[in-house]
Amino acid sequence: MVLENIRNFSIIAHIDHGKSTLADRLLEYTGALSEREMQNQFLDKMDLERERGITIKAQAVRLNYRAANGKDYILNLIDTPGHVDFTYEVSRSLSACEGALLVVDASQGVEAQTLANVYLALENDLDVFPVLNKIDLPAADPERVKQEIEDIIGLDAHDAVLASAKEGIGTREILEEIVTKIPPPQGDSNKPLKALLFDSWYDQYQGVIVLVRILDGMVKKGDKIQLMSNRRNYEVLKVGVFSPAMCEVAALSAGEVGFIIAGIKDVQDAKVGDTITSLHNPCDGPLPGFKEVQPMVFSGLYPIDTSQYEQLRDALAKLKLNDSSFSYEPETSLALGFGFRCGFLGLLHMEIIQERLEREFNLDLITTAPTVVYKVHRLDGSIITIESANQLPPVQEIQYVEEPFILASIHVPNEFVGGILALCEEKRGVQREIKYLTPTRVMVIYELPLNEVVLDFYDRLKSITKGYASLDYEHLDYRRSNLERLNIMINGEVVDALSLIIHKDKAYFRGRDLVSKMKELIPRQMFEIAIQAAIGNKVIARETVKAMRKDVLAKCYGGDITRKRKLLEKQKEGKKRMKNVGNVELPQEAFLAILKVEG
């Protein structure tokens, strides 16, 4: 196939704006799927993707289309994840394309994530053209949304395609736009092989399958290839395309998109953004933009039933096979037993992994409150990174602590702006700007500490705005902050699973909330229990669970006071001894409830 007749494109859209449904229509129209095979959201292979309406992994499908001009074209649709946590994956998938469809809901208009991904596309020099979806809805207002696209994004939208993926309206027009507006790929099949790896996953029979976009050269079965980031060498066992089922082809050449199977055993070796080249005739250098993805949010995962520890370990290993951005290592907690400390790209990534563990592997888990990566500058000049409160060195060794900040852009209807500003101020945010995008929609931009966002920011945001807000964020930098470790002590013993790193201004309120919550949850014992919140050696809040009392005087009818006193003294002694040796069992509910205390 000549380069002139190939088009590589992706679809950019906010969650629920109809991206996967539109992809279904394109597959159906070009005959890639028969009516019988058609299932909604065909490209979202995981149940979880379909259910939450999000795309987690990239997919690539080859469509054959005969255009109005009579020529046959190959259209490669690269389906990208649309969520903020997967920004790096999106940017790599986009760099495999020459153009993108910007799908906007004709009733809702432009949302925060749409903006972020459009900017990524423009950074990668893609030609972007808008499509207004859901025009069949009664609330659709195409003219207003066209104006929004022009005002906010700066794209010319006067001739945007009007479509309804659900009803199949506008599908042909979209395909014609792809052929006419998106440029063909550049590349030279005679040069040394240079291919961009933009996704990989594990297949239990064939090892790791990698999705690639060939930029120069060609690759066929039997070739020796090398991954440039780690210099590993492999022999190609199979090359092919998805149409949308896997089809083996003789070779993939410049401009094409397809898969390579080369007996790679570990997804860790096939990193997104890497460059693949020929072992004996390598290209001059790797593609720019490759970076190792670093986890930003950490959380402890513990099985509720300790006998499930091995199952949890196997489950994590299986998930890691398909997700190189997820990391885990074993850790133990005095309170929760054996578990794992896991690293995630962000909150959605964390939720997805937890849900997959519970759903696909039937595990019951406790997750500790999410934390972020802090940088601790010690007095001896060294810098250490920590991701849990238990790793924080003693106060006397610390010079200062830095925490990560993010730049958050929040799109909200204007009646909710007051509530959003109050929430951001409460979360120690620094206001950057407020833009009125339209008379009814506002974009609020804040710098926020990631630590404050990981706990409950998103839930609070949604409840303040009745679900109308959309949030997008990017990582900024590390900043010096006044952070301390807050410990919860029960009868003088520190409960390690409940320690947290918190800003000094909030420590007192958080400590008070935690101890009063625990007072309700810890069952009464035969002796009194002191629950304290402390910073270092200084106790800042305390509650006491009163002891239950057995009436030892019940058998004394009247009689001498000294007899009664003797029995009471004896009871007092017993309680004292009990308090020294008795340890308090914390019920599981106590942990779960504490993790839900408002941040």
Swiss-Prot record:
Residues the record lists as binding GTP: D16, H17, G18, K19, S20, T21, N133, K134, I135, D136
Source domain of life: Bacteria
Catalytic activity, EC: 3.6.5.n1
Keyword field contains Protein biosynthesis: yes
CDD domains documented for this protein: EF4_II, EF4_III, LepA, lepA_C
Domain tr-type G: 4-186
Family: Belongs to the TRAFAC class translation factor GTPase superfamily. Classic translation factor GTPase family. LepA subfamily.
Pfam families documented for this protein: EFG_C, GTP_EFTU, GTP_EFTU_D2, LepA_C
Membrane topology term: Peripheral membrane protein
Main location group: membrane
Keyword Glycoprotein among UniProt keywords: no
Molecular function per GO: GTP binding; GTPase activity; ribosome binding; translation elongation factor activity
Any GO BP: positive regulation of translation
UniProt name for this protein: Elongation factor 4
InterPro entries for the chain: EF-4, EFG_III/V, EFG_V-like, EFTu-like_2, G_TR_CS, LepA_C_sf, LepA_CTD, LepA_IV
GO cellular component: plasma membrane
Keywords assigned by UniProt, alphabetized: Cell inner membrane, Cell membrane, GTP-binding, Hydrolase, Membrane, Nucleotide-binding, Protein biosynthesis
Catalyzed reaction equations: GTP + H2O = GDP + phosphate + H(+)
Subcellular locations according to the entry: Cell inner membrane
UniProt enzyme class: hydrolase
Cited function: Required for accurate and efficient protein synthesis under certain stress conditions. May act as a fidelity factor of the translation reaction, by catalyzing a one-codon backward translocation of tRNAs on improperly translocated ribosomes. Back-translocation proceeds from a post-translocation (POST) complex to a pre-translocation (PRE) complex, thus giving elongation factor G a second chance to translocate the tRNAs correctly. Binds to ribosomes in a GTP-dependent manner.
